[in-house]
Curated annotation (Swiss-Prot):
It is an enzyme of class 7 (translocase). This is NADH-quinone oxidoreductase subunit C/D. In the N-terminal section; belongs to the complex I 30 kDa subunit family. In the C-terminal section; belongs to the complex I 49 kDa subunit family. SUPFAM superfamilies: HydB/Nqo4-like, Nqo5-like. GO terms for molecular function: NAD binding; NADH dehydrogenase (ubiquinone) activity; NADH:ubiquinone reductase (non-electrogenic) activity; quinone binding. InterPro entries: NADH_DH_suC, NADH_DH_suCD, NADH_Q_OxRdtase_suD, NADH_quin_OxRdtase_su_C/D-like, NADH_UbQ_OxRdtase_30kDa_su, NADH_UbQ_OxRdtase_49kDa_CS, NDH1_su_D/H, NiFe-Hase_large. NDH-1 is composed of 13 different subunits. Subunits NuoB, CD, E, F, and G constitute the peripheral sector of the complex. Residues 1-190 are annotated as: NADH dehydrogenase I subunit C. Its EC number is 7.1.1.-. It is a peripheral membrane protein.
Length: 600
């Protein structure tokens, strides 16, 4: 065991050299603001991490947005309670911090800005002046950490009820129900909650009317079939026309990021499946890859291909549900029943391989739970023979229908500029003509070894274009699966590494030290080096990412989950104003979201 830990230290040193500390943007920033203006942090995120002064935040953000190859998308924004973090050597003193993750499409590079804050002065200026999609992220940061956002247009709770007290992601906020007093709903509390639910347009930034007429306000949801989950949209209407609307989320919030602080690195894997409950193994991929970056694990080729195969099966499964329910939202019922027949075949295949269906929790730190079963090739081959003809029938019978096209073409349309401003990813972004698929541009798990195309639209993302891109993505996923079938490598299904969890069984049968390692890693969890890592993947609905902070423990110090659906729902008002209520139903169907992905 001592030798294994020595090897791990050597691997740590190798990983520390993989940072983007020499990224050209660091030089550009120093040329503009001076060589001593920033603290550059060495991490395993693969992204330059730069600590900036609060007073310079907006100026630095504006500079990055106006560079020759600009950073045009605010990908993520959130906070961290730094008070209990022990491994902070070389970093600015901070009780709390806020990070801003920006993407440059032209450079295919990212940068992460961080601001250090003291507990007695928790405030940062709003980033909405530069990126409108900062709005929701800043609301959640204030809600979860109590960090004041100066100048924010509508700083209210977003995930929790308006009557909630406290800031849940602070380290001194309890993480378990048993740490709270028993809940009692008294008459006074019930009256308070009912009063908080009373709708007042002014509280949502809406006017009751004009000088000549009053507006009508309509609640769509939170229990409406076209809302695709527990989701409410408050509509401000002038007849059938939508003057404005406000999405109201949080009904499905489960505290997934807080749970990450109380689960071991290994035992958190099942929670990832339930972030976006249709994606299955696709959701496990970014988390496991981020943990493997922390550990310095390189998995065998067989593991990479198996992970890709399971991810593409779940991509097809999710896309089939999306396409069929979109058609149903427009008014046709039959395709849903056909699609569920096809999805059943996928679930049968997934169950044969993993033992589970919707939520396999099958990826492991350093590999997968077990090897592929005998006969998997036959099941996959039968599916690959079946599915292409079914796709052709969907397209011919439903998606080329003139009524469907009339209801969806030109509806909720936006261009590349709007997509980037709102943090849109996935098919919604590619429909605008921007060719950005993480599997191609930032390949992971061996995607660079597969031959497939990235479907791209003609410049405007409308409802119909988004759906048709998903159809073509299905065909490309079938291509990838065929290559997995034809080129599955031989070899182990787990990496031979001391932090592989659980370790290969043969290790536990050699001598007592390896058996002790197995016992500790399964019961308490593996101890990860104190570092930060980040991994994004092309998930079923857009880009999903995990940003993990380890403080040298068996559990994550901070687990940040960035989901695509959160950003996509924030964009709804800008895309649908001036349209009809019937157009909104089609638009919601074209986004491809589930509320668990939004609310986490």
């Amino acid at each position: 065991m001592v030798n294994n830990m020595t090897d791990l230290t050597a691997q740590d040193a190798a990983w520390s050299t993989r940072d983007h500390l020499d990224d050209p943007v660091i030089g550009e920033l120093r040329n503009r603001f001076g060589p001593d203006a920033f603290t550059v942090q060495a991490t395993r995120t693969g992204v330059p991490v730069v600590w900036v002064k609060r007073e310079q935040l907006l100026e630095v953000g504006d500079f990055l947005k106006k560079l020759p190859k600009p950073y045009v998308m605010l990908f993520d924004l959130h906070g961290m309670d730094e008070r209990l973090r022990t491994h902070r050597d070389g970093l600015p003193a901070a009780d709390f911090s806020v990070f801003y993750h920006l993407i440059s499409i032209e450079r295919n590079r990212d940068i992460m800005l961080k601001v250090a804050l003291s507990e007695n002065d928790l405030r940062v200026p709003t980033f909405t002046k530069l990126f409108p999609n900062a709005n929701w992220y800043e609301r959640e940061t204030w809600e979860m950490f109590g960090i004041d956002i100066e100048g924010h247009p509508h700083l209210t709770r977003i995930m929790m009820p308006q009557t909630w007290e406290g800031h849940p992601l602070r380290k001194d906020y309890p993480a378990r129900a048993t740490e709270f007093d028993p809940f009692e709903l008294t008459k006074a509390k019930q009256d308070l909650e009912m009063e908080a639910l009373t709708f007042k347009p002014e509280d949502w930034g809406m006017k009751r009317g004009t000088d000549n007429e009053d507006f009508m306000f309509l609640n769509l949801g939170p229990n409406h079939p076209s809302a695709h989950g527990a989701f409410r949209i408050i509509l401000q209407l002038d007849g059938e026309e939508i003057v404005d609307c406000v999405p109201d989320i949080g009904y499905h919030h489960r505290g997934a990021e807080k749970m990450g602080e109380r689960q071991s690195w290994h035992s958190y894997i099942p929670y990832t499946d339930r972030i976006e409950y249709l994606g299955g193994c696709v959701n496990e991929m970014p988390y496991v890859l981020a943990v493997e970056k922390l550990a310095g694990i390189t998995v065998p080729d067989r593991v990479n291909v198996i992970r890709v195969m399971l991810s593409e099966l779940f991509r097809i499964n999710s896309h089939l549900l999306y396409i069929s329910t979109f058609i149903q939202d427009v008014g046709a019922m039959t395709p849903v029943f056909f699609a569920f027949t096809d999805r059943q075949k996928i679930y049968d295949l997934v169950e044969a391989i993993t033992g589970f269906r919707m939520h396999p929790a099958w990826f492991r730190i350093g590999g997968v739970a077990h090897d592929l079963p005998r006969g998997w090739e036959r099941l996959l081959r039968e599916f690959l023979e079946w599915m292409p003809k079914r796709l052709d029938s969907y397209e011919k019978a439903a998606l080329r229908n003139t009524i469907l096209k009339g209801r969806s073409q030109g509806v909720a349309a936006y261009g590349a500029k709007e997509a980037l401003e709102w943090g849109t990813t996935g098919a919604g972004l590619r429909a605008t003509g921007i060719d950005f698929d993480v599997r191609k541009w930032r390949p992971y798990s061996g995607y660079e070894n597969f031959d497939f195309e990235v479907p791209v639209g003609g410049g405007v993302s409308d409802c119909y274009t988004r759906v048709m891109l998903k159809v073509e993505e299905l065909r490309q996923s079938l291509r990838i699966l065929q290559q997995c079938l034809d080129n599955m490598p031989e070899g182990p299904f787990k990496a031979d590494h001391p932090l592989t969890t659980p370790p290969p069984k043969e290790r536990t049968l050699q001598h007592i030290e390896t058996l002790i390692t197995h016992f500790l890693q399964v019961s308490w969890g593996p101890v990860m080096p104190a570092q930060e890592s980040f991994q994004m993947v092309e998930a079923t609905k857009g880009i999903n990412s995990y940003y993990l902070t380890s403080d040298g423990s068996t559990m994550s110090y901070r687990t940040r989950v960035r989901t695509p659906s959160f950003a996509h729902l924030q964009q709804i008002p800008s895309a649908i104003r001036g349209s009809l209520v019937s157009d909104l139903i089609v638009y919601l169907g074209s986004i491809d979201f589930v509320m668990s992905d939004v609310d986490r």
